[in-house]
Amino acid sequence: FFYGCTNKSSYSNSDDAYINYATDMQLMYHIGGNAPMTKSDKGYYYIGEDGIVIFIDKETKKATPLCSKPNCTHDDPEACDAYLNLTQKPDTLVGAHDSAIQYNDGYLYALCGEYDKSYINYNTYLMRMKPDGNQRENLTGSFNFYAFEWFIHRGYFYCSTDSSVIRIPLDSPKSEPQILYKTDYY
């Protein structure tokens, strides 16, 4: 074998060679299937205790709840903007929540959920909001499946269900999911 040095300009460079944190899945922040932290151009966001979103400013390194209310004590989910109604995981103890958040193309995304008025049916959906925590919206409507693991990558929401891997385009989030893989054994 022969080894040598070369300058970087001689390498072939493709769009797929590097991760763009603004549009690609941020694999480096996934821990055991969850992604409790995500990077943006201004800093980092993470899911803290009880589903509260914390922003860490890149310049000042100051961590603050993502809440717009100046005198908020951040201890009441009904009153504090920093709380997310994160989806409950069906395969864990009651009350365990998905703790994933992802920054992608100028927005923050999280899986959220809520019971209907009868408290029988649990509705899960993909929530999108601006990086300042405002303009929250239910992007997909209620899923008719449970999303076990999920991420956003290059314009698509990908997730695994109990029997398949699907994707939904973010530019048409209420469209029928495209099945990428389906098992016959579940």
Q: Residue spans of the language-model regions?
A:
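C-terminal motif of bacterial Sec signal peptides marking the signal peptidase cleavage site
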Residues: F2-G4
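An edge-strand/N-cap motif at the start of beta-rich repeat modules
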Residues: N7-T64
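Repeated scaffold domains used in trafficking and secretory/extracellular systems
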Residues: L27-S40, D75-Y103, F143-R154, K182-Y186
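Residue position within the beta-strands of beta-propeller blades
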Residues: Y45-I47, Y109-C112, Y158-S160
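Short glycine/acidic-enriched loop and turn motifs that connect beta-strands
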Residues: D50-I52, E114-I120, S164
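A short loop-to-beta-strand structural motif that recurs across blades of beta-propeller domains
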Residues: I52-I54, P65, Y125-M127, S164-I166
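Short loop/turn segments that connect beta-strands within beta-propeller blades
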Residues: D57-K61, K130-N134, P169-K174
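Beta-propeller fold detector
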Residues: A63-A79, E137-F143, E176-D184
